[in-house]
Curated annotation (Swiss-Prot):
Segments in the Extracellular topological domain: 54-58, 132-155, 198-222, 286-300, 371-373, 428-441
Organism placement in taxonomy: Eukaryota, Viridiplantae, Streptophyta, Embryophyta, Tracheophyta
GO biological process: amino acid transport
Family: Belongs to the amino acid/polyamine transporter 2 family. Amino acid/auxin permease (AAAP) (TC 2.A.18.2) subfamily.
The species this protein was found in: Arabidopsis thaliana
Matching InterPro entries: AA_transpt_TM
Membrane topology, as annotated: Multi-pass membrane protein
Name of the featured protein: Lysine histidine transporter-like 2
Transmembrane segments annotated in the record for this chain: 33-53, 59-79, 111-131, 156-176, 177-197, 223-243, 265-285, 301-321, 348-370, 374-396, 407-427
Function: Amino acid transporter.
Amino acid sequence: MEKSQSSPTKDASTKQKNVDDWLPITSSRNAKWWYSAFHNVTAMVGAGVLSLPYAMSNLGWGPGVTIMIMSWLITFYTLWQMVQMHEMVPGKRFDRYHELGQHAFGEKLGLWIVVPQQLIVEVGVDIVYMVTGGKSLKKIHDLLCTDCKNIRTTYWIMIFASIHFVLAHLPNFNSISIVSLAAAVMSLSYSTIAWATSVKKGVHPNVDYSSRASTTSGNVFNFLNALGDVAFAYAGHNVVLEIQATIPSTPEKPSKIAMWKGVVVAYIVVAICYFPVAFVCYYIFGNSVDDNILMTLEKPIWLIAIANAFVVVHVIGSYQIYAMPVFDMLETFLVKKMMFAPSFKLRFITRTLYVAFTMFVAICIPFFGGLLGFFGGFAFAPTTYYLPCIMWLCIKKPKKYGLSWCINWFCIVVGVILTILAPIGGLRTIIISAKNYEFFS
Protein backbone atom coordinates (compact mmCIF):
# COMPACT_ATOMS: atom_id res chain seq x y z
CA MET A 1 0.00 0.00 0.00
CA GLU A 2 2.79 2.35 0.97
CA LYS A 3 4.57 1.56 -2.29
CA SER A 4 1.53 2.44 -4.43
CA GLN A 5 1.17 5.81 -2.67
CA SER A 6 4.81 6.81 -3.14
CA SER A 7 4.98 5.68 -6.75
CA PRO A 8 2.84 8.52 -8.26
CA THR A 9 4.82 11.05 -6.21
CA LYS A 10 8.08 9.58 -7.48
CA ASP A 11 6.79 9.57 -11.08
CA ALA A 12 5.72 13.22 -10.78
CA SER A 13 9.12 14.14 -9.35
CA THR A 14 10.92 12.31 -12.17
CA LYS A 15 8.71 13.99 -14.77
CA GLN A 16 9.38 17.42 -13.20
CA LYS A 17 13.15 16.76 -13.26
CA ASN A 18 12.98 15.68 -16.92
CA VAL A 19 11.14 18.90 -17.81
CA ASP A 20 13.65 21.03 -15.83
CA ASP A 21 16.52 19.26 -17.58
CA TRP A 22 14.94 20.20 -20.92
CA LEU A 23 14.04 23.84 -20.19
CA PRO A 24 16.76 26.35 -21.23
CA ILE A 25 17.32 28.05 -17.84
CA THR A 26 17.68 24.93 -15.66
CA SER A 27 19.14 22.41 -18.12
CA SER A 28 22.79 23.28 -17.43
CA ARG A 29 24.35 24.28 -14.09
CA ASN A 30 28.08 24.01 -14.75
CA ALA A 31 28.95 27.64 -15.58
CA LYS A 32 32.11 29.31 -14.20
CA TRP A 33 32.20 32.78 -12.62
CA TRP A 34 33.63 34.32 -15.77
CA TYR A 35 30.59 33.08 -17.71
CA SER A 36 28.49 35.36 -15.51
CA ALA A 37 30.94 38.22 -16.19
CA PHE A 38 30.62 38.16 -19.97
CA HIS A 39 26.91 37.23 -19.92
CA ASN A 40 26.28 40.30 -17.75
CA VAL A 41 28.47 42.54 -19.94
CA THR A 42 26.61 41.31 -23.02
CA ALA A 43 23.25 41.89 -21.32
CA MET A 44 24.15 45.29 -19.88
CA VAL A 45 26.35 47.04 -22.46
CA GLY A 46 24.14 47.07 -25.49
CA ALA A 47 22.74 49.46 -28.01
CA GLY A 48 22.02 51.81 -25.12
CA VAL A 49 25.66 52.92 -24.84
CA LEU A 50 25.51 54.38 -28.36
CA SER A 51 22.69 56.73 -27.35
CA LEU A 52 24.33 58.06 -24.17
CA PRO A 53 26.01 61.12 -25.82
CA TYR A 54 22.60 61.98 -27.31
CA ALA A 55 21.00 61.57 -23.87
CA MET A 56 23.69 63.87 -22.43
CA SER A 57 22.86 66.49 -25.08
CA ASN A 58 19.24 66.49 -23.89
CA LEU A 59 20.09 66.44 -20.18
CA GLY A 60 23.00 68.93 -20.11
CA TRP A 61 26.23 68.64 -18.13
CA GLY A 62 24.90 68.96 -14.56
CA PRO A 63 21.82 66.71 -14.69
CA GLY A 64 23.51 64.38 -17.22
CA VAL A 65 26.58 63.58 -15.11
CA THR A 66 24.45 63.28 -11.95
CA ILE A 67 21.90 60.92 -13.53
CA MET A 68 24.58 58.76 -15.20
CA ILE A 69 26.58 58.23 -11.99
CA MET A 70 23.48 57.86 -9.80
CA SER A 71 22.03 55.25 -12.19
CA TRP A 72 25.29 53.27 -12.12
CA LEU A 73 25.31 53.25 -8.29
CA ILE A 74 21.60 52.43 -7.89
CA THR A 75 21.64 49.60 -10.43
CA PHE A 76 24.88 48.17 -8.97
CA TYR A 77 23.15 48.07 -5.57
CA THR A 78 19.92 46.50 -6.89
CA LEU A 79 21.93 43.91 -8.84
CA TRP A 80 23.71 42.98 -5.58
CA GLN A 81 20.26 42.51 -4.01
CA MET A 82 19.18 40.17 -6.82
CA VAL A 83 22.32 38.04 -6.44
CA GLN A 84 21.81 37.82 -2.65
CA MET A 85 18.13 36.85 -2.97
CA HIS A 86 18.76 34.00 -5.45
CA GLU A 87 19.30 31.47 -2.63
CA MET A 88 17.87 33.28 0.38
CA VAL A 89 15.64 30.27 1.23
CA PRO A 90 17.86 27.31 2.31
CA GLY A 91 17.72 24.46 -0.19
CA LYS A 92 15.81 26.47 -2.83
CA ARG A 93 17.01 28.49 -5.81
CA PHE A 94 14.96 31.24 -7.44
CA ASP A 95 16.12 30.53 -10.99
CA ARG A 96 13.81 33.06 -12.62
CA TYR A 97 12.84 36.65 -11.86
CA HIS A 98 9.16 35.75 -11.52
CA GLU A 99 9.94 32.96 -9.01
CA LEU A 100 11.53 35.55 -6.72
CA GLY A 101 8.50 37.78 -7.32
CA GLN A 102 6.18 34.94 -6.29
CA HIS A 103 8.17 34.43 -3.07
CA ALA A 104 7.98 38.16 -2.26
CA PHE A 105 4.39 38.95 -3.32
CA GLY A 106 2.60 35.59 -3.39
CA GLU A 107 2.01 32.94 -6.08
CA LYS A 108 -0.49 34.81 -8.29
CA LEU A 109 0.37 38.44 -7.54
CA GLY A 110 4.10 37.77 -8.03
CA LEU A 111 3.44 36.42 -11.52
CA TRP A 112 1.23 39.35 -12.49
CA ILE A 113 3.71 41.93 -11.20
CA VAL A 114 6.89 40.47 -12.70
CA VAL A 115 6.07 38.49 -15.86
CA PRO A 116 4.39 41.27 -17.93
CA GLN A 117 7.21 43.72 -17.17
CA GLN A 118 9.95 41.16 -17.77
CA LEU A 119 8.38 40.16 -21.09
CA ILE A 120 8.06 43.80 -22.18
CA VAL A 121 11.74 44.33 -21.35
CA GLU A 122 13.07 41.21 -23.04
CA VAL A 123 10.87 41.36 -26.13
CA GLY A 124 11.43 45.14 -26.29
CA VAL A 125 15.21 44.73 -26.18
CA ASP A 126 15.11 42.11 -28.91
CA ILE A 127 13.03 44.42 -31.12
CA VAL A 128 15.47 47.31 -30.54
CA TYR A 129 18.41 45.00 -31.30
CA MET A 130 16.75 43.91 -34.55
CA VAL A 131 16.62 47.60 -35.50
CA THR A 132 20.21 48.20 -34.34
CA GLY A 133 21.59 45.16 -36.16
CA GLY A 134 19.79 46.02 -39.40
CA LYS A 135 20.78 49.70 -39.34
CA SER A 136 24.42 48.86 -38.53
CA LEU A 137 24.57 46.43 -41.47
CA LYS A 138 23.10 49.14 -43.71
CA LYS A 139 25.67 51.66 -42.41
CA ILE A 140 28.53 49.25 -43.24
CA HIS A 141 27.14 48.77 -46.74
CA ASP A 142 26.68 52.51 -47.32
CA LEU A 143 30.19 53.33 -46.04
CA LEU A 144 32.05 50.70 -48.05
CA CYS A 145 29.98 50.80 -51.23
CA THR A 146 29.10 54.42 -51.97
CA ASP A 147 28.23 53.71 -55.63
CA CYS A 148 25.99 50.73 -54.85
CA LYS A 149 22.23 50.79 -55.16
CA ASN A 150 20.43 51.78 -51.96
CA ILE A 151 19.00 48.80 -50.07
CA ARG A 152 16.01 49.35 -47.79
CA THR A 153 16.43 49.16 -44.01
CA THR A 154 13.67 46.52 -44.06
CA TYR A 155 15.89 44.11 -46.01
CA TRP A 156 18.86 44.69 -43.68
CA ILE A 157 16.68 43.89 -40.66
CA MET A 158 15.59 40.69 -42.42
CA ILE A 159 19.23 39.79 -43.14
CA PHE A 160 20.10 40.36 -39.48
CA ALA A 161 17.09 38.26 -38.39
CA SER A 162 18.23 35.35 -40.58
CA ILE A 163 21.17 34.82 -38.19
CA HIS A 164 18.75 34.42 -35.28
CA PHE A 165 16.59 31.92 -37.13
CA VAL A 166 19.66 29.67 -36.70
CA LEU A 167 21.10 30.75 -33.31
CA ALA A 168 17.70 30.71 -31.59
CA HIS A 169 17.79 26.92 -31.63
CA LEU A 170 20.81 26.65 -29.32
CA PRO A 171 19.30 24.96 -26.24
CA ASN A 172 20.47 26.97 -23.20
CA PHE A 173 22.66 29.77 -21.75
CA ASN A 174 25.84 27.72 -21.63
CA SER A 175 25.45 26.74 -25.29
CA ILE A 176 25.59 30.44 -26.29
CA SER A 177 28.68 31.17 -24.14
CA ILE A 178 31.01 31.61 -27.13
CA VAL A 179 28.52 33.97 -28.81
CA SER A 180 28.16 35.90 -25.54
CA LEU A 181 31.94 36.14 -25.00
CA ALA A 182 32.43 37.49 -28.54
CA ALA A 183 29.60 39.98 -27.92
CA ALA A 184 31.16 41.18 -24.64
CA VAL A 185 34.55 41.76 -26.33
CA MET A 186 32.83 43.61 -29.18
CA SER A 187 30.96 45.92 -26.79
CA LEU A 188 34.22 47.04 -25.18
CA SER A 189 35.78 47.42 -28.64
CA TYR A 190 33.13 49.59 -30.29
CA SER A 191 32.72 51.71 -27.15
CA THR A 192 36.47 52.40 -27.21
CA ILE A 193 36.37 53.18 -30.94
CA ALA A 194 33.47 55.62 -30.36
CA TRP A 195 35.20 57.78 -27.73
CA ALA A 196 38.78 57.38 -29.03
CA THR A 197 37.77 58.42 -32.56
CA SER A 198 35.91 61.41 -31.09
CA VAL A 199 39.06 62.46 -29.20
CA LYS A 200 41.11 62.11 -32.41
CA LYS A 201 38.67 64.41 -34.25
CA GLY A 202 39.01 67.07 -31.56
CA VAL A 203 36.33 69.39 -30.25
CA HIS A 204 33.80 70.19 -32.96
CA PRO A 205 34.06 73.75 -34.38
CA ASN A 206 31.37 75.96 -32.87
CA VAL A 207 30.46 73.20 -30.39
CA ASP A 208 27.23 74.08 -28.60
CA TYR A 209 26.07 72.63 -25.27
CA SER A 210 22.78 74.52 -25.15
CA SER A 211 19.37 72.86 -25.42
CA ARG A 212 18.68 70.99 -28.67
CA ALA A 213 15.07 72.08 -29.09
CA SER A 214 13.98 75.65 -29.79
CA THR A 215 10.84 75.46 -27.62
CA THR A 216 10.36 74.83 -23.90
CA SER A 217 8.01 71.90 -24.54
CA GLY A 218 10.55 70.37 -26.94
CA ASN A 219 13.28 70.60 -24.32
CA VAL A 220 11.06 69.04 -21.66
CA PHE A 221 10.10 66.09 -23.88
CA ASN A 222 13.72 65.59 -24.97
CA PHE A 223 14.78 65.58 -21.30
CA LEU A 224 12.17 62.93 -20.50
CA ASN A 225 13.25 60.79 -23.45
CA ALA A 226 16.87 61.06 -22.31
CA LEU A 227 15.88 59.67 -18.89
CA GLY A 228 14.54 56.60 -20.71
CA ASP A 229 17.75 56.30 -22.75
CA VAL A 230 19.77 56.15 -19.52
CA ALA A 231 17.36 53.64 -17.95
CA PHE A 232 17.63 51.46 -21.08
CA ALA A 233 21.42 51.38 -20.71
CA TYR A 234 21.12 49.53 -17.37
CA ALA A 235 18.99 46.53 -18.25
CA GLY A 236 20.93 43.46 -17.08
CA HIS A 237 18.72 42.81 -14.04
CA ASN A 238 16.07 41.16 -16.17
CA VAL A 239 18.29 38.16 -16.85
CA VAL A 240 20.55 38.13 -13.76
CA LEU A 241 18.74 35.34 -11.87
CA GLU A 242 18.54 33.28 -15.05
CA ILE A 243 22.32 33.72 -15.52
CA GLN A 244 22.97 32.82 -11.86
CA ALA A 245 20.84 29.68 -12.32
CA THR A 246 23.55 28.27 -14.61
CA ILE A 247 26.21 28.41 -11.84
CA PRO A 248 26.64 25.31 -9.60
CA SER A 249 25.86 25.76 -5.91
CA THR A 250 26.68 23.88 -2.69
CA PRO A 251 26.09 24.81 0.98
CA GLU A 252 29.83 25.42 1.33
CA LYS A 253 30.10 27.42 -1.88
CA PRO A 254 26.79 29.05 -2.84
CA SER A 255 26.36 30.40 -6.36
CA LYS A 256 26.26 34.01 -5.14
CA ILE A 257 30.05 33.98 -4.52
CA ALA A 258 30.93 33.18 -8.15
CA MET A 259 28.06 35.29 -9.47
CA TRP A 260 29.06 38.38 -7.50
CA LYS A 261 32.65 38.10 -8.73
CA GLY A 262 31.34 38.09 -12.30
CA VAL A 263 28.97 41.01 -11.62
CA VAL A 264 31.78 43.19 -10.19
CA VAL A 265 33.94 42.55 -13.27
CA ALA A 266 30.95 43.27 -15.51
CA TYR A 267 30.17 46.56 -13.76
CA ILE A 268 33.77 47.73 -14.04
CA VAL A 269 33.54 47.05 -17.80
CA VAL A 270 30.19 48.91 -17.86
CA ALA A 271 31.84 51.98 -16.29
CA ILE A 272 34.77 51.78 -18.76
CA CYS A 273 32.30 51.66 -21.66
CA TYR A 274 29.60 54.08 -20.53
CA PHE A 275 31.29 57.07 -18.93
CA PRO A 276 33.94 57.82 -21.60
CA VAL A 277 31.38 57.40 -24.42
CA ALA A 278 28.76 59.59 -22.71
CA PHE A 279 31.03 62.37 -21.46
CA VAL A 280 33.82 62.48 -24.08
CA CYS A 281 31.53 62.25 -27.13
CA TYR A 282 29.19 64.91 -25.74
CA TYR A 283 32.18 67.16 -24.96
CA ILE A 284 33.43 66.79 -28.56
CA PHE A 285 30.14 67.17 -30.48
CA GLY A 286 27.79 68.97 -28.09
CA ASN A 287 24.15 69.05 -29.16
CA SER A 288 24.95 68.12 -32.79
CA VAL A 289 25.44 64.45 -31.83
CA ASP A 290 23.06 61.86 -33.36
CA ASP A 291 20.96 59.39 -31.34
CA ASN A 292 23.55 56.77 -32.35
CA ILE A 293 27.11 58.10 -31.93
CA LEU A 294 28.44 55.88 -34.74
CA MET A 295 26.16 57.72 -37.16
CA THR A 296 27.87 60.99 -36.13
CA LEU A 297 31.36 59.59 -36.70
CA GLU A 298 31.69 59.29 -40.47
CA LYS A 299 35.49 59.20 -40.85
CA PRO A 300 37.81 57.33 -41.03
CA ILE A 301 35.40 55.20 -43.05
CA TRP A 302 37.18 51.87 -42.47
CA LEU A 303 37.20 52.34 -38.68
CA ILE A 304 33.53 53.31 -38.47
CA ALA A 305 32.67 50.29 -40.66
CA ILE A 306 34.61 48.05 -38.24
CA ALA A 307 32.86 49.62 -35.24
CA ASN A 308 29.47 48.96 -36.84
CA ALA A 309 30.53 45.36 -37.53
CA PHE A 310 31.41 45.05 -33.83
CA VAL A 311 27.94 46.39 -32.97
CA VAL A 312 26.36 43.74 -35.20
CA VAL A 313 28.30 40.93 -33.46
CA HIS A 314 27.42 42.35 -30.05
CA VAL A 315 23.69 42.68 -30.66
CA ILE A 316 23.65 39.12 -32.05
CA GLY A 317 24.85 37.94 -28.62
CA SER A 318 22.62 40.34 -26.68
CA TYR A 319 19.54 39.27 -28.63
CA GLN A 320 20.15 35.66 -27.60
CA ILE A 321 20.80 36.56 -23.93
CA TYR A 322 17.43 38.34 -23.71
CA ALA A 323 15.58 35.80 -25.86
CA MET A 324 16.58 32.81 -23.69
CA PRO A 325 14.32 33.70 -20.70
CA VAL A 326 11.46 34.34 -23.15
CA PHE A 327 12.03 30.90 -24.70
CA ASP A 328 12.03 29.46 -21.18
CA MET A 329 8.69 31.14 -20.33
CA LEU A 330 7.07 30.01 -23.59
CA GLU A 331 8.35 26.45 -23.32
CA THR A 332 7.41 26.20 -19.62
CA PHE A 333 3.87 27.35 -20.43
CA LEU A 334 3.50 24.94 -23.36
CA VAL A 335 4.91 21.93 -21.50
CA LYS A 336 3.55 22.47 -17.97
CA LYS A 337 0.23 24.21 -18.67
CA MET A 338 -0.71 23.11 -22.20
CA MET A 339 0.76 19.62 -21.61
CA PHE A 340 2.82 19.45 -24.81
CA ALA A 341 5.60 16.87 -24.74
CA PRO A 342 9.13 18.38 -24.65
CA SER A 343 10.50 17.97 -28.17
CA PHE A 344 12.75 19.54 -30.79
CA LYS A 345 9.70 20.18 -32.98
CA LEU A 346 7.96 22.22 -30.24
CA ARG A 347 11.14 24.22 -29.57
CA PHE A 348 11.78 24.81 -33.29
CA ILE A 349 8.27 26.15 -33.99
CA THR A 350 8.13 28.32 -30.82
CA ARG A 351 11.51 29.96 -31.28
CA THR A 352 11.13 30.48 -35.03
CA LEU A 353 7.80 32.26 -34.49
CA TYR A 354 9.36 34.47 -31.79
CA VAL A 355 12.23 35.59 -34.05
CA ALA A 356 9.75 36.25 -36.88
CA PHE A 357 7.58 38.35 -34.53
CA THR A 358 10.46 40.57 -33.30
CA MET A 359 11.66 40.99 -36.89
CA PHE A 360 8.22 42.09 -38.09
CA VAL A 361 7.76 44.66 -35.29
CA ALA A 362 11.31 46.00 -35.87
CA ILE A 363 10.52 46.48 -39.57
CA CYS A 364 7.30 48.34 -38.71
CA ILE A 365 8.79 50.77 -36.13
CA PRO A 366 12.57 51.14 -36.65
CA PHE A 367 12.94 54.28 -34.48
CA PHE A 368 16.07 53.68 -32.42
CA GLY A 369 16.00 56.73 -30.11
CA GLY A 370 12.27 56.70 -29.41
CA LEU A 371 12.18 52.96 -28.76
CA LEU A 372 15.02 53.27 -26.24
CA GLY A 373 13.27 56.04 -24.33
CA PHE A 374 9.86 54.36 -24.35
CA PHE A 375 10.98 50.87 -23.33
CA GLY A 376 13.61 52.28 -20.96
CA GLY A 377 11.06 54.13 -18.89
CA PHE A 378 8.04 51.87 -19.27
CA ALA A 379 9.59 48.56 -18.18
CA PHE A 380 13.34 48.84 -17.55
CA ALA A 381 12.99 51.30 -14.67
CA PRO A 382 10.61 49.04 -12.66
CA THR A 383 12.56 45.80 -13.12
CA THR A 384 15.97 47.46 -12.67
CA TYR A 385 15.55 50.38 -10.27
CA TYR A 386 12.84 49.53 -7.79
CA LEU A 387 11.29 46.03 -8.03
CA PRO A 388 14.42 44.48 -6.41
CA CYS A 389 14.14 47.07 -3.59
CA ILE A 390 10.44 46.36 -3.01
CA MET A 391 11.16 42.61 -2.88
CA TRP A 392 14.03 43.26 -0.46
CA LEU A 393 11.73 45.29 1.83
CA CYS A 394 9.00 42.60 1.68
CA ILE A 395 11.33 39.67 2.36
CA LYS A 396 14.12 41.11 4.54
CA LYS A 397 11.96 43.68 6.40
CA PRO A 398 14.83 46.04 7.39
CA LYS A 399 14.38 48.38 10.35
CA LYS A 400 12.14 51.35 9.51
CA TYR A 401 14.16 54.55 8.88
CA GLY A 402 17.39 52.53 9.12
CA LEU A 403 20.12 52.87 6.46
CA SER A 404 18.93 49.90 4.37
CA TRP A 405 15.29 51.07 4.55
CA CYS A 406 16.22 54.63 3.47
CA ILE A 407 18.46 53.49 0.58
CA ASN A 408 15.75 51.18 -0.75
CA TRP A 409 13.06 53.86 -0.57
CA PHE A 410 15.36 56.35 -2.33
CA CYS A 411 15.86 53.85 -5.19
CA ILE A 412 12.10 53.21 -5.33
CA VAL A 413 11.28 56.94 -5.60
CA VAL A 414 13.89 57.48 -8.36
CA GLY A 415 12.59 54.42 -10.24
CA VAL A 416 8.94 55.46 -10.02
CA ILE A 417 9.78 58.96 -11.32
CA LEU A 418 11.61 57.36 -14.28
CA THR A 419 8.67 55.02 -14.96
CA ILE A 420 6.18 57.89 -15.09
CA LEU A 421 8.22 60.48 -17.00
CA ALA A 422 10.47 58.63 -19.49
CA PRO A 423 7.78 56.88 -21.63
CA ILE A 424 6.16 60.27 -22.33
CA GLY A 425 9.32 61.53 -24.05
CA GLY A 426 9.93 58.24 -25.86
CA LEU A 427 6.37 58.05 -27.20
CA ARG A 428 6.57 61.63 -28.49
CA THR A 429 9.87 60.86 -30.26
CA ILE A 430 8.29 57.81 -31.94
CA ILE A 431 5.26 59.88 -33.05
CA ILE A 432 7.48 62.63 -34.53
CA SER A 433 9.67 60.05 -36.32
CA ALA A 434 6.59 58.23 -37.64
CA LYS A 435 5.27 61.37 -39.38
CA ASN A 436 7.90 61.08 -42.11
CA TYR A 437 8.15 57.28 -42.16
CA GLU A 438 6.80 54.99 -44.85
CA PHE A 439 6.19 51.38 -43.79
CA PHE A 440 8.69 48.81 -45.10
CA SER A 441 10.86 51.56 -46.60
